[in-house]
Amino acid sequence: MENLDALVSQALEAVQSAEDINALEQIRVHYLGKKGELTQVMKTLGNLPAEERPQVGALINVAKERVTEVLNARKASFEQAELTARLAAECIDVTLPGRGQTSGGLHPITRTLERIEQFFTHIGYGIAEGPEVEDDYHNFEALNIPGHHPARSMHDTFYFNANMLLRTHTSPVQVRTMESQQPPIRIVCPGRVYRSDSDITHSPMFHQIEGLLVDRDINFADLKGTIEEFLRVFFEKELAVRFRPSYFPFTEPSAEVDMECVMCSGKGCRVCKQTGWLEVMGCGMVHPNVLRMSGIDPEEFQGFAFGMGVERLAMLRYGVNDLRLFFDNDLRFLAQFR
């Protein structure tokens, strides 16, 4: 048993001298493994007299349990030290100032479109869309625009060939809607349109939204009330509105809509060129020829239509003086609208 005590002391000393978990594992195998020192001592029980075996076996088991206990305690100590070191390395100081996330936002044109659509869908209009590459018939002919009209000129329209072009307005969507369904029709048609023009107030590509209502007993008073209410809601203020007689091939009578300048409240400024008025859209009663070519009887149904540039309304609402700013992708400008 003296050899057993010495063996246990040797094992405990080795455990205390171990520098890491790998060394502990080697010590465990050396003393407690299948061929370990204490395991070999246990195998010598067969050489002892039968009456001594229980006592000696119990002593060997106590020795093994003591070594195992010290091994496990030392291993737990190493694991705790390793965990503490890892936590210290990964420690987050919650008192440090945070790094803010830069959030995106809707483009001002998108915001303006959504605002317009929200008003008209609220009063019962649907949203209709159509192709940006149009044929001559739907872009011009079906809208009562004659062949000699200046809008058909290469200077104003982007042509692919003699019959196909980039649409110059969203009116073709109205035509396609009237061709595919019978009145009552209440739609707004938002989308990109293209014209050969580019300066501080014009872009070769811009956004337009047009509206169409076709039903029985529709008159100019209905159109006037709709537009006045839209402008009041869109700009969130009571504005003077006037309708000036004008000419559009697809409406008769036709009018240009002016509103009180939102910058100077009608007193006259640089934006309104000292007139106190701003032109915001065109409108009119749908021409009987347009209804007729779309398969609608103008004797039974009447309608009104209007169209406005989305960029124009966005410029007025947000006080932007250069149309091109909307398309420059300058985050310093766009971040103001988040």
Swiss-Prot record:
One of its GO terms (molecular function) is ATP binding. The keyword Aminoacyl-tRNA synthetase applies. Its EC number is 6.1.1.20. It catalyses: tRNA(Phe) + L-phenylalanine + ATP = L-phenylalanyl-tRNA(Phe) + AMP + diphosphate + H(+). InterPro entries: aa-tRNA-synth_II, aa-tRNA-synth_II/BPL/LPL, Phe-tRNA-synth_IIc_asu, Phe-tRNA_ligase_II_N, Phe_tRNA_ligase_alpha1_bac, Phenylalanyl-tRNA_Synthase, tRNA-bd_arm. It holds the Pfam family Phe_tRNA-synt_N. GO terms for biological process: phenylalanyl-tRNA aminoacylation. Mg(2+) binds at residue 252. Disulfide bonds: none annotated. Coiled coil: none annotated. Keywords: Aminoacyl-tRNA synthetase, ATP-binding, Cytoplasm, Ligase, Magnesium, Metal-binding, Nucleotide-binding, Protein biosynthesis. Signal peptide: none annotated. Binds 2 magnesium ions per tetramer. Belongs to the class-II aminoacyl-tRNA synthetase family. Phe-tRNA synthetase alpha subunit type 1 subfamily. This is Phenylalanine--tRNA ligase alpha subunit.
